[in-house]
Amino acid sequence: MRLVPASTLVARCKKPARPSRTVSTAMAALVLATLAVGCQAAGTGAGSSPAGTIIVAAIPGIDDAPLYVAAKNGLFRSAGLDVTIRSFQSVSQELQALNSGKVDIAEGDYADFFYAEAASPRPGLRIVADGYHAAPGVMEVLTGPHSDITTPQDLAHKTIGTPEPQVIPIQGSTPYSLETVATQSVLANDGVTSVRWKALPSQDLISALAHHQVSAILVQEPYILEAESQLGAIEVLDSCSGATASLPLSGYFATESYARRQPDALADFRSALQQAQANAVLPGPEQAVLAHNPGMSMQSASLVTIGAYPTTLDAASLQRVANLMFNSGVLVKNLLDVASMTGS
């Protein structure tokens, strides 16, 4: 769930019959932390890092905000770790850097990393920590304010714009991703089994809806906020509801070989990260980053819907994602055993 330029986020349009989207000041500050904390650009490197030194690949966004807070507030240093965060543009770039040893840990979408693991001829990835879970309003199918689509059933045979997949290849006419897999599950429960997908760059989805190139768009926050603000877009379906409620969205991964060599460093990293995740809903040092915000207003940040930051690593919870992928046909050979990736 990646941040759009802060300057594009303006006062949010309020929608009827929806719970309040306002979050605490600390939570808003947590969103802004990814913008205020400097990241090193992705670069070259060789081999694995020395003991106690960890290089983390991340695509700055809402989901990995606690990573930046932990770094800024010295939680990693207190754990005896020297953590460097390198920013990347895509999960595919992260995976390449992870597998080549240029980074030690990579944060990203569960569906992409699970697909990469399932496609590998031998086990290669380990889950270091759980990162981010869905909550109501973080992933939605939206239509324009004057659309005749008002219910999930109205989406049958319509074209839905969705972000281009980063790792999973398009199969048939479906651009599989965690977004489309979750949405298909909710649609099926509503009796809708046939929709058309149109994969587009994330930054083009709102324009496509505005110019009627698609009937609806499937987006996560903060694009939901942007679509509502710019177009008055209306929610038709919450993709993380019912069977997909509280769905795990992203996590932190290392290679199996690195996890075997550096178990203590990974345990210390997970502990420090979970401390930042646990403090995410409490007033605290996160508020200090607001003074250094390069563009997002406090009002806009407080209107972004934020999911949950888990403080434990539960293989059974993460297995829900693998099950969705298998049932939808993304994992065509075998059901991925997530517990084997956690050491549990």
Question: What is each stretch, according to the model?
Answer:
Residues 3-27:
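Bacterial N-terminal signal peptides that target proteins for export
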Residues 34-38:
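C-terminal motif of bacterial Sec signal peptides marking the signal peptidase cleavage site
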Residues 40-43:
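Bacterial signal peptide processing site
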Residues 47-199, 215-221, 235-238, 246:
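Short, glycine-/small- and polar/acidic-enriched structural segments
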Residues 111, 147, 198-288:
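Pocket-lining segment of extracytoplasmic ligand-binding domains
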Residues 133-134, 241-244, 307-315:
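Short, solvent-exposed loop/beta-turn-alpha elements that line the ligand-binding surface or hinge
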Residues 260-330:
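Secondary-structure end/capping motifs
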Residues 325-344:
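Conserved C-terminal helix/tail region of periplasmic/extracytoplasmic solute-binding proteins
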